[in-house]
């Protein structure tokens, strides 16, 4: 079970998240939506302990961390002077993973990352991330920068992975979430509201309602 409780998260005395509770007990794909600046990325970082906040986040009895939870930032940090193969080994060593021999995306092994396009860099990071099977994945705008074929490959991979893992996807591509997620969390006014797949019509009304 994944449980995130954020009593308060502030930046320079501005409240970003407050009295937020998120609890997921079953594997599946879950969406996270919200307007720009609502705190979607901050939520992920708080849960992982990458940002200071008042609250707690647990996966079962363990604290959520980068050791037991996978995280793909919207703009992954890569080392341009490494090849993809070198980066995969570096990532595996950093997070105590077994280097993989099979990868989701085919990429040149001997090219430096600095020679890659934005989409190829995203593929490089995802390949490194998926070297291990995690129980929880936080994916922040994972489809951004990828071409149609890569998005198709990634989505099908995540759908299969979601049979045994909790996968939370932050995305502005709402149709992908509607068509594939078990439920969607709407982040608005510092808090989250959950909508299951039978309530997605209500989600749109709530999202565009200017009242709290």
At which residue positions do the language-model features occur?
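Helix N-cap at the start of a conserved alpha-helix in ABC-type nucleotide-binding domains
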Residues: 148-149
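ABC-family P-loop ATPase nucleotide-binding domains
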Residues: 75-125, 132
